């Protein structure tokens, strides 16, 4: 996948900006606060229908303005053109058109433009709350597996209904009967989600080991998927997983009624990251944690290509600020051999064949 052009108006601190990246590496450079990251966020909007920081569209609207627009053009590896147009105003909410057809559901667009990002704020994947790690794995899988996306949305709806029932003041007999129905529905979808996640992590970890060879010290990376199945985590048979879930919910029933929330399921699962069998969050330096996340993003690029047949666009925000120059340079060179890479930095980076865009004066150039 390749971004051919993008124009943004009243987006973050940009009144109007037009950007045409190169086919390989493009370095967006400029002073801090000049809006480099905003360009990447606009591209991310076109790929995943939201910015880096989530679904609060209002925060991307330039102060004092009533509407922001993003217009972009992409070309797939098969030469298929895709045009994405996004408008947002607090009065009319967000509208997304793909090839001039308005999306009825934003989720239907996920996977059309595969995209891998690295931003400093994503360090929360390593050292933040479990929800951040679940978001990483869900966003990755949803870009190539539409059934998983559908299952995830259905699971969230059933979970919301089940939590509402647990919090209701209805007759206990009514709650008990309805709870059995919702639990059966939740177990069926939860099993599908857990199986896909486990298979993803298993293959992803094997690929991560190969990518990690370019990082110094020859460390051995691994990822552990922690599910609410407890000591049954190694199960891969659907019927057995369903049985364990049913037993788990039966055991937790009184606690759930008391706490008024669902206490088991994929929404409570987590990932643990290791280097040489030592948990990264506890024992690794900040530099090692950052390098591990970068390696994960490199792995994800290859994984999405393998799963979908389309090379993702790679967006790297402020990659060089805290990462070893050799490691970051190797990463960029490796990614560039596989697709389009767009990087932000405060200073212009040297490199053969790199395209440049100065966000301070909106000028483009290219190294010979």
From Swiss-Prot:
Q: Where in the cell is it found?
A: Cytoplasm
Tell me a Gene Ontology molecular-function term this record carries: single-stranded DNA binding
Any GO BP annotation: SOS response
Binding locations of ATP = 30-37
Per the record, its GO cellular-component terms are: cytoplasm
The record's keywords, sorted A to Z, are: ATP-binding, Cytoplasm, DNA damage, DNA repair, DNA replication, DNA-binding, Nucleotide-binding, SOS response
Q: Which Pfam families match?
A: AAA_23 (PF13476)
Taxonomic superkingdom: Bacteria
Q: State the family it belongs to.
A: Belongs to the RecF family.
Q: What does this protein do?
A: The RecF protein is involved in DNA metabolism; it is required for DNA replication and normal SOS inducibility. RecF binds preferentially to single-stranded, linear DNA. It also seems to bind ATP.
For this protein, the record's NCBIfam families field holds: recf
Under what name is this protein listed?
A: DNA replication and repair protein RecF
Annotated gene: recF
């Amino acid at each position: 996948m390749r971004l051919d052009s993008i124009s943004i108006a009243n987006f973050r601190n940009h009144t109007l900006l037009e950007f045409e990246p190169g086919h390989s590496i493009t370095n967006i450079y400029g002073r801090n606060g000049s809006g480099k990251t905003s360009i990447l966020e606009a591209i991310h909007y076109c790929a995943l229908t939201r910015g880096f920081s989530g679904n609060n569209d209002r925060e991307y609207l330039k102060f004092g303005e009533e509407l922001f627009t993003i217009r972009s053009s992409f070309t797939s590896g098969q030469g298929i053109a895709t045009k994405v147009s996004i408008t947002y105003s607090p009065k009319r909410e967000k509208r997304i058109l793909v090839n001039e057809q308005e999306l009825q559901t934003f989720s239907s667009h996920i996977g059309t433009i595969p995209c891998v990002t690295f931003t400093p704020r994503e360090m929360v994947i390593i050292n933040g709350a479990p929800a951040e790690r679940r978001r990483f794995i869900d966003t990755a899988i949803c870009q190539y597996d539409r059934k998983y996306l559908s299952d995830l949305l259905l699971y969230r709806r059933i979970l919301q209904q089940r939590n509402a029932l647990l919090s209701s003041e209805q007759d206990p007999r009514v709650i008990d009967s309805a709870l059995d129905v919702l639990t059966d529905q939740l177990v069926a979808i939860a099993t599908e989600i857990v199986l896909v996640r486990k298979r993803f992590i298993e293959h992803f970890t094997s690929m991560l080991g190969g990518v990690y060879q370019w990082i110094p010290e020859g460390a051995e990376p691994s990822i552990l998927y922690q599910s609410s199945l407890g000591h049954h985590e190694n199960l891969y048979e659907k019927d057995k997983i369903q049985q364990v879930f049913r037993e788990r919910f039966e055991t937790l029933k009184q606690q759930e009624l008391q706490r008024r929330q669902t206490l088991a399921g994929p929404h409570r699962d987590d990932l643990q990251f290791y280097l040489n069998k030592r948990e990264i969050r506890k024992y690794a330096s900040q530099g090692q944690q950052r390098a591990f996340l970068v390696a994960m993003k490199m792995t994800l690029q290859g994984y999405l290509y393998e799963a979908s047949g389309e090379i993702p666009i790679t967006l790297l925000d402020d990659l060089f600020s805290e990462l070893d120059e050799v490691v970051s340079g190797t990463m960029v060179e490796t990614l560039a051999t596989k697709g389009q890479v767009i990087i932000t930095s405060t200073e212009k980076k040297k490199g053969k064949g790199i395209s440049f865009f100065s966000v301070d004066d909106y000028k483009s150039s290219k190294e010979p």
